[in-house]
Amino acid sequence: MLNVIYALFFRELKTRFGANRHLGYLWVVGEPMTIILIITIIGTVIREFHHQVMPEGISIFMFLISGIMPFFMFRSIVIQLMNGIGANLALFAYKPVKPIHVFIARALLEFCIYFVIFIVVLFFAGWFFHLEVIPRDFLGVSFCIFLLFCSSFSLGICFAVVWHFVEPLRTLLVYFSVVVYWTSAIILPTWLTPRFLLDILYYNPLLHVIELLRYYFFENYPLADDYNNYYIIFWIIFLLFIGLVVYYYNRQALTAVRKE
């Protein structure tokens, strides 16, 4: 199994960056630089309101980076797992290769890509903009990123099976990332969110992990509610159980559909 995942990982790596490998690697760095440019423009526009929006010691730039980059990783893993079965149909003719191997390889690849992107973004933010980019609690931030990885993997498996069999739901799943993006405090700080709306968003497990990630990253970060890791861990276990059970009982059906 490890050999299969290893081979799939590097196959996906080559496919991900296309035929021009050097241009693909350059884009890995160019994409976050584009994001930084956009965020810098936004930060410049609202700079005069900085002290009214952000607590002391937290820049808007780093606030946005600490939410956008982890969310991009989460979204990319879910999308890649959803498309994993259809993109590897020819490989499933070989008995050792199973869809679960593709899921693992794709999830690990996206994690590695966005981990490198995050490090590069932090390096440029610290080097050129002289911002504080070292988390105050490195282990806490790492654990939150690990929870994001696990949640995206478990959710991706569920969506992959649904995406493969239930055509009418495909459109709804496409809009899922948009909904999650605007309900997880990626852009708008929780302390600026109306209380009645925050009480509803509290049930979003991704909001918990994003807020805790920022709490571990910044000094004096204000938590608007009692966010905790146990809530997101519960959802990870629940979704992973559902996803693996659905996958296990449909693995033969997946093979049958592929052969047709």
Please report, for each region that a protein language model flagged, where it lies by residue.
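Hydrophobic transmembrane alpha-helices and immediately adjacent juxtamembrane helices
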Residues: 1-260
